[in-house]
């Protein structure tokens, strides 16, 4: 290698290393910030993933009556649940599918639970959104997905017309119970069997 080549190589490597050093210096604060937020997110993911894994083991060993639930695929945060219409209710004989989505903040924030099967119910709208206090303001980290599913089953047995999501169905429930029950059975037969 000639002296000129050697100088050019040294000069380019020193300018390259000074450019890298300048880039490192300007990027250092950003890396620290992202490490802090990544660390916080990792802890949340770790906490929520551990909790969800434990609940999956529990619900697999001891599922609530007439219910099942578990991950849709490899994503522990996306579950599918099945609820059988409670015996003696207008939903008896129906098989209802629900989606359960956990956030990284779980169990400190409630899971999002929605019906995928259409249902005629004053506390469940046409998008499958459920009006249930424990899925909103009355959520507690002490609650589990098994308890949530039991509460939903209870809602299928005894709706809450005092806090409706679908006002017309709640009014019908209170003023013309026979017609309400007929419609609920009809929808169950049409959409859930």
From Swiss-Prot:
Residues 1-45 are annotated as: Disordered. Residues 22-35 have a biased composition (Basic and acidic residues). It is found in: Nucleus. The modification N-acetylserine is found at residue 2. Residues 36-45 have a biased composition (Polar residues). It catalyses: S-ubiquitinyl-[E1 ubiquitin-activating enzyme]-L-cysteine + [E2 ubiquitin-conjugating enzyme]-L-cysteine = [E1 ubiquitin-activating enzyme]-L-cysteine + S-ubiquitinyl-[E2 ubiquitin-conjugating enzyme]-L-cysteine; S-ubiquitinyl-[E1 ubiquitin-activating enzyme]-L-cysteine + [acceptor protein]-L-lysine = [E1 ubiquitin-activating enzyme]-L-cysteine + N(6)-monoubiquitinyl-[acceptor protein]-L-lysine. Pathway: Protein modification; protein ubiquitination. One of its GO terms (biological process) is protein polyubiquitination. Residues 47-193 form the UBC core domain. SMART domains: UBCc. InterPro entries: UBQ-conjugat_E2_core (IPR000608), UBQ-conjugating_AS (IPR023313), UBQ-conjugating_enzyme/RWD (IPR016135). It comes from the Eukaryota. ISGylation suppresses ubiquitin E2 enzyme activity. Autoubiquitinated in vitro. Keywords: Acetylation, ATP-binding, Isopeptide bond, Nucleotide-binding, Nucleus, Transferase, Ubl conjugation, Ubl conjugation pathway. The active site is at 131 (glycyl thioester intermediate). One of its GO terms (molecular function) is ATP binding. Interacts with RNF14. This is Ubiquitin-conjugating enzyme E2 E1. It comes from Homo sapiens (Human). The gene is UBE2E1.
């Amino acid at each position: 290698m000639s002296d000129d080549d050697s100088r050019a190589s040294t000069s380019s490597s020193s300018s390259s290393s000074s450019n890298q050093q300048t880039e490192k210096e300007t990027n250092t604060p950003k890396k620290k910030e992202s490490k802090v937020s990544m660390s916080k997110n990792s802890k949340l993911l770790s906490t929520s993933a551990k909790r969800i894994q434990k609940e999956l083991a529990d619900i697999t060993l001891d599922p609530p009556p007439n219910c099942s639930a578990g991950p849709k695929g490899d994503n522990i945060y996306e579950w599918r649940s099945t609820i059988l219409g409670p015996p003696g209710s207008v939903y008896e004989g129906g098989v209802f599918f629900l989606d359960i989505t956990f956030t990284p903040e779980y169990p400190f924030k409630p899971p999002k639970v929605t019906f995928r099967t259409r249902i005629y119910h004053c506390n469940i709208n046409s998008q499958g959104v459920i009006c249930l206090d424990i899925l909103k303001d009355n959520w507690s980290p002490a609650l589990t997905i098994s308890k949530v599913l039991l509460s939903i089953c209870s809602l299928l047995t005894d709706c809450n017309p005092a806090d409706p999501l679908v006002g017309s169905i709640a009014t019908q429930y209170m003023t013309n119970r026979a017609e309400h029950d007929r419609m609920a059975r009809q929808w169950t037969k049409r959409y859930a069997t």
